Amino acid sequence: MPTISCDKEELYKALGREYTTQEFDELCFQFGIELDEDTTNDPERSPSERPSLKIDIPANRYDMLCLEGIAQALNVFNRRMATPQYKLLPSTTSLTISPETSEIRPYAAAAILRGVKLDPIRYQSFIALQDKLHANLCRNRTLVAIGTHDFSVMEGPFTYEALKPEEINFVPLNQTQEINGSNLLEFYKDSKHLSRYLHIIANSPRYPVILDAKRRVCSLPPIINSEFSKISVDTRDIFIDVTATDKTKLEIVVNMMTTMFSCYCEEPFTIEPVNIISEHNGCTRVTPNLNPTCFKADIDYLNEACGLSLPEDEICHLLTRMMLTAKPNPNDSKTLLVYVPPLRADILHQCDIMEDLGIAYGYDNLKHTYPAHSVTFGKPFEVNRLADIIRNEVAYAGWSEVMPFILCSHDENYAWLRKTDDSKAVQLANPKTLEFQVVRSSLLPGILKTVRENKNHALPIKIFEVSDVAFCDYSRERMTRNERHLCAIFAGLNSGFEQIHGLLDRVMLMLNTKRIMNPKDSDAVGYWIEAEDDSTFFPGRCAAVYYRKDFGTAGIRVGVFGVLHPLVLEKFELTSAASAVEIDLTLWV
């Protein structure tokens, strides 16, 4: 859940009254949000810093990512104001999208807010809304990027193009020197704020740019705007550009940016649209589209799901508290037509309308009832049931379970285990830290790191993990597959090979899998071990585990165990000898 920090005085002013902390906490609770913190009495707050309220917002309520949206939603909920009716002014400019943008960011939208009256607090809220949208819905600008400009210094019509880096020259925001696009990545590689976005366009032969009629670069999404169109507290006309790889999220973002701050326009709730000309992909239209979306909601469903028996007129009246306009369906007496305003992008189904009805009615007002039928419980997946049995049996044998991170570094997954990259590991596209680069394809790195962090404990250390590893599998819909593995390690004064071997035999006994002593002379179901050279283990002290699931079939390699190689122990900073086993449990499901 995003946490929004609002100026306490400004929020209460917008709500029309002062609240005690307890009163406001109760209001938030009734609405379905949560007051996380009131900094009024925070000893760490500096005297020059105004008190603020930190409010946890549901992740899908993009209309509440700023003070203006929170105040508007609560005012409508308290019936202090009606749902705003947004008005589109005549369009005066256009944005033409070139076909080349399909190579990198194919969609764009724009809008203009006229006569906006900003002050320092409103300006900060405007910038904060962009940041919150970028961090949440926009997925750190990978899906959508927002640019805001002082329209008074720009000249339309505008074009959205994809140019070669060397063809781009402009002065970036908060800079004084002009730079060439070919130097952009180098220029911002050490920027704490912008370097995290460079990967989005780093491998593209063309960069997206928005140009005005004079061919001046207004924006180079998703990285930086131009200095010449920089907005300030004194800006009165704001041009908003939005570019995206996802058209649905593009429309949501442009609607949020315009509806939230159109309240400060000279004529409140008015927005000047922009004609988007995109003939190459059939996306020519006018943005923003502020027409309400109509849903059909079954009256019986709304009542039964909430445990109510309300007439349709009362349901319609209650839904107005949630900014929804409902009326009886003239063609079906059992349903309502519910009109959802453009800022309520979280409404996707009649179940969302049902939830809003429950909030408007008040969850505290719902009758306390018990289910009419006996409560049932879900049946566990077989792989989970098997994993739980394994956990218990290994723990009974005197081993302690650990739960390391699912992610690890590329080196930990390969080089530190003395393995080469086989391209089977699922890699993160833009990892934030070196420790979390890939999804582990073995449980061993996590187990070894756990021993490293506990190497000062009394020896021996006997720990295990039963969990999933992941592999790339391009034959599947999600192009990955999971396997449930068991991994255990013994670290002590001696290698403890016999301890690991004994644990393997104990697990196989528990799985009712017999040991086959001469697999070449037998077609029986069971398991056997064969000597193997594995670079992770000491030469001559390693064996592979094979399992024959059905009579007469070939054995399948399901695991490996042995004494860990000294170079592996050195990489993980271990000074004790150690042995480990790892087997794939999925064949027993």
Swiss-Prot record:
Question: Is Manganese set as a keyword in this record?
Answer: no
The residues that the entry says bind Mg(2+) are 346, 352, 355-356
Looking up SUPFAM superfamilies in the UniProt record yields: Class II aaRS and biotin synthetases (SSF55681), Putative DNA-binding domain (SSF46955)
Instruction: Name the top EC class.
Output: ligase
Provide the E.C. number(s) assigned to this enzyme.
6.1.1.20
Report the catalytic activity.
tRNA(Phe) + L-phenylalanine + ATP = L-phenylalanyl-tRNA(Phe) + AMP + diphosphate + H(+)
Q: Which GO terms describe its molecular function?
A: ATP binding; magnesium ion binding; phenylalanine-tRNA ligase activity; RNA binding
> Where is the protein situated, by its record's location annotation?
Cytoplasm; Nucleus
GO BP annotations, alphabetical order: cytoplasmic translation; phenylalanyl-tRNA aminoacylation
Identify the PROSITE patterns for this entry.
Answer: B5
Q: Which SMART domains match?
A: B3_4, B5
Required co-factor(s) are: Mg(2+)
Keyword annotations: Aminoacyl-tRNA synthetase, ATP-binding, Cytoplasm, Ligase, Magnesium, Metal-binding, Nucleotide-binding, Nucleus, Protein biosynthesis
Which cellular components does GO assign to this protein? cytosol; nucleus; phenylalanine-tRNA ligase complex
Q: Does the keyword Plastid apply?
A: no
Domain (B5) ranges: 290-368
Quaternary organization: Tetramer of two alpha and two beta subunits.
Q: Which family does it belong to?
A: Belongs to the phenylalanyl-tRNA synthetase beta subunit family. Type 2 subfamily.
Q: Which NCBIfam families match?
A: pheT_arch
The molecule here is called Phenylalanine--tRNA ligase beta subunit
